[in-house]
């Protein structure tokens, strides 16, 4: 998965938003509806990927995820924004808007 994720980030013409999460993570469950809303609002302008760190530990290690939820935004293959912990939808949306203009 890590290599596939790398390929997606590197080759995507659209910004890529990644949510690293786990089933047992309470804050991840709090953020999940916001991530879903983001995917819906920016459909066609943003790729949203959810990565379960328990099922894909190599991807979590590759992207140096130390706390979850970990949210990352890549544009043109470059990391533009990253945060760990639950944040409000409006903050996520603001970061995406900055990236996509």
Swiss-Prot record:
GO CC entries: cytoplasm
Keyword Hydrolase attached: no
Superkingdom, natural source: Bacteria
Transmembrane segments: none
NCBIfam families membership: thioredoxin
Family: Belongs to the thioredoxin family.
The protein's name: Thioredoxin 1
The organism of origin for this protein: Chlorobaculum tepidum (strain ATCC 49652 / DSM 12025 / NBRC 103806 / TLS)
Gene it is expressed from: trx1
